[in-house]
């Protein structure tokens, strides 16, 4: 028996799942050699992906955006995924003018991504003050045009475990000042963030990653240091993880999937100053199925990965289906000789077998 894409409650059997094709509303596709690896792994499982703009140089204008999009599409086509659609974003930075955002929207960019300066990889150019008058005009333009504001919600100067919670006052300010602006709090990791998103109007939503459904801080530093579990925002407490897990399976349309899959070369992870980011795209479908099954919530998986995000962004739902079966497989210990994936060497219980 196969689950239906028309009635989520029909996805009840535990050996085969068929759902509408999936979206990833937070993906790092990188550049050059890493891009040639990241794109096929994302396109293999996701019909669309919201592409993060924190490359070098950052996607801050149409020339860079067009070139980057063409590079992604070229790799996707050559890898056998001609239908893959990269949803492009523009990086919001100090000093940006509203005209740039207007052009970005006209070009087809669906979101502007705001990183607090220094918050994560390649965020040296970002936002130092969300309340600056010049950025107010940018946010007003986004609000008027229906463009989504995607935010990395951390305050970089706060202690690591408090950065997300400290940012929530900025999230609340943005939601109050720009009541029609759609805002996504990316990759939430704390109970306080879940509660804040729930308390704010329907214009505010959040993405949840697969790795934050599995990790706590102990998985990063509790025994031996595991650099392949290091990401930003860093994994938090058991209580925080429980809140994020409950949000993912709640059926609340404010919460949807964004992988934040972020590949780095092995030598840049296993070193004295390792990069933040976890490469999850090869295992995300398997782990999501495993997690939702463990919580007796497979009937809500499709909405989390295929419906809620698309509806929030005002996009049509994907056509076609993706099928997973319950069949053990071992995650490779390394991809392309230099990228270590999440759950490397472990045996997972679900695997993708068909896309149509």
Give the label of every model feature segment.
Residues 21-32, 149-155, 208, 259-261:
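Histidine-centered catalytic micro-motifs
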Residues 74-83, 176-180, 201-202, 296-297:
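Short helix-capping segments at alpha-helix termini
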Residues 86, 161-180, 198-208, 262-282, ...:
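Short, electropositive alpha-helical surface patch
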Residues 208-275, 322-356:
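Active-site neighborhoods of metal-dependent hydrolases
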Residues 250-317:
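His/Asp/Glu-enriched, well-ordered alpha-helical/loop segment
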């Amino acid at each position: 028996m196969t689950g239906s894409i028309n009635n989520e409650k029909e996805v009840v059997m535990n050996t085969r799942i068929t759902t509408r094709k999936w979206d990833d509303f937070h993906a790092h596709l990188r550049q050059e050699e890493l891009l040639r690896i990241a794109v096929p792994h994302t396109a293999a499982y996701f019909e669309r992906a919201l592409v993060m703009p924190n490359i070098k140089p950052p996607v801050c204008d149409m020339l860079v955006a067009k070139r980057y999009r063409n590079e992604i599409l070229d790799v996707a086509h050559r890898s056998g995924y001609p239908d893959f659609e990269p949803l492009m974003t523009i990086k919001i930075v100090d000093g940006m003018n509203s005209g740039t955002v207007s052009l970005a929207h006209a070009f087809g960019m669906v979101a502007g991504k705001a990183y607090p300066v220094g918050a994560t990889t390649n965020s040296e150019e970002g936002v130092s003050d969300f309340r600056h008058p010049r950025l107010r005009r940018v946010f007003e333009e986004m609000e008027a045009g229906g463009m989504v504001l995607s935010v990395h919600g951390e305050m970089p100067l706060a202690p690591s475990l408090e950065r997300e919670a400290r940012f929530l006052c900025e999230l609340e300010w943005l939601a109050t000042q720009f009541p029609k602006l759609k805002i996504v709090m990316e990759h939430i990791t704390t109970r306080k963030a879940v509660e804040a998103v729930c308390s704010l109007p329907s214009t505010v939503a959040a993405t949840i990653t697969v790795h934050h459904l599995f990790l706590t801080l102990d998985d990063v530093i509790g025994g031996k240091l595991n650099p392949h579990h290091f990401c930003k925002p860093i994994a938090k407490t058991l209580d925080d993880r429980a809140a994020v897990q409950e949000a993912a399976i709640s059926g609340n349309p404010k919460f949807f999937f964004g992988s934040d899959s972020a590949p780095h070369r092995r030598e840049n992870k296993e070193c004295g100053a390792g990069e933040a980011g976890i490469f999850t795209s090869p295992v995300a479908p398997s782990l999501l199925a495993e997690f939702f099954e463990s919580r007796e919530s497979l009937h809500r998986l499709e909405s989390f990965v295929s419906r809620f995000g698309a509806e929030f962004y005002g996009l049509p739902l994907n056509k076609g289906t993706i099928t997973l079966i319950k069949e053990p497989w071992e995650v490779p210990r390394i991809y392309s000789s230099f990228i270590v994936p999440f759950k490397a060497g472990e045996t997972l219980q679900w695997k993708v077998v068909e896309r149509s």
